[in-house]
């Protein structure tokens, strides 16, 4: 079995490679792709095949997918450019005759009104039309989106536009492990997995930060424009801030809520919880 992993220089792609190795896939049967192979040197030292590839360069993708049996297609990071970039990946996979494409999408991509969902929906539609066997991993939010803000929460509290909505966030490591399970076991072709961890509200997030830190941390719910301004004032570019605020709007209406059972079944255990992730981050 040869498995090609795109985006291996990114957080999720790297974790997927590590999960494949832990599951016993020989290093020489894993191909890690990145724009800059220098950033994959440590994997090469461990026997992983590394190749340069760029979603904007179809020739590099075709060369990178040579002899690939399975393709772990990690969605691109350039919001607004994903549709043409993902087209290049799918077309290169089709030309290479890849046996299975596993794509990281977003929760409820086919029906979601999140700004982030449109490009994933278009990619899913193109995958279906391509004739390639595929699996859709519709990942919800990352727990790291919250644990990475711990210092800010302690200083300023938790702010957002999520209301009482619940978000099914899980760690990148758990999403990566689930992807590795799909890549190394049979019976997944054609499946759509809605993946997420145990759900929580922003009020529950603030309460858990309070419990673990001993500080009084509260959640302040804001209108979407006001929350966007908070994010911009914190240094985020306006388009990115607007996208994050829109995600909170979606959380308020259930856009990032999924039952935990799909992820739990793939992992063979319950996913890491918010409380556990905060404990590690603290």
Predicted regions and their residues:
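Rossmann-fold cofactor-recognition segment
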Residues: 44-57
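Compositionally biased, low-complexity linear motifs
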Residues: 65-69, 282
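Conserved beta-strand segments of the P-loop GTPase G domain that flank and frequently precede/overlap
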Residues: 74
């Amino acid at each position: 079995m040869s498995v090609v992993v795109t985006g291996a220089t990114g957080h999720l792609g790297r974790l997927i490679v590590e999960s494949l190795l832990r599951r016993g896939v020989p290093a020489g049967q894993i191909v890690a792709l990145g724009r800059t192979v220098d950033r994959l040197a440590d994997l090469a030292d461990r026997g992983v095949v590394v190749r340069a590839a760029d979603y904007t360069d179809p020739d590099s993708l075709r060369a990178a997918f040579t002899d690939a049996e399975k393709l772990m297609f990690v969605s691109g990071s350039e919001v607004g450019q994903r549709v043409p970039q993902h087209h290049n990946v799918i077309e290169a996979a089709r030309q290479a005759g890849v046996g299975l494409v596993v794509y990281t999408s977003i929760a409820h991509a086919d029906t979601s009104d999140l700004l982030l969902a449109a490009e994933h929906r278009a990619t899913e539609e193109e995958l279906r039309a391509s004739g390639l066997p595929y699996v859709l991993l519709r990942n919800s939010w990352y727990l790291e989106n919250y644990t990475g803000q711990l210092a800010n929460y302690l200083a300023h509290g938790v702010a957002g536009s999520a209301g009482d909505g619940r978000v099914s966030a899980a760690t990148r490591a758990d999403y990566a492990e689930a992807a590795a399970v799909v890549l190394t076991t049979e019976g997944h072709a054609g499946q759509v997995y809605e993946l997420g961890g145990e759900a929580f509200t922003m009020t529950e997030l603030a309460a858990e930060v309070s419990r673990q830190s001993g500080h009084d941390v509260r959640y302040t719910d804001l209108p979407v424009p006001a929350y966007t301004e908070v994010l911009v004032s914190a240094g985020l570019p306006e388009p990115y801030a607007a996208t994050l605020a829109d995600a909170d709007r979606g959380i308020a209406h259930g856009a990032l809520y999924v039952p935990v059972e799909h992820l739990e079944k793939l992992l063979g255990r319950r996913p890491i919880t918010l409380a556990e992730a905060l404990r590690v981050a603290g």
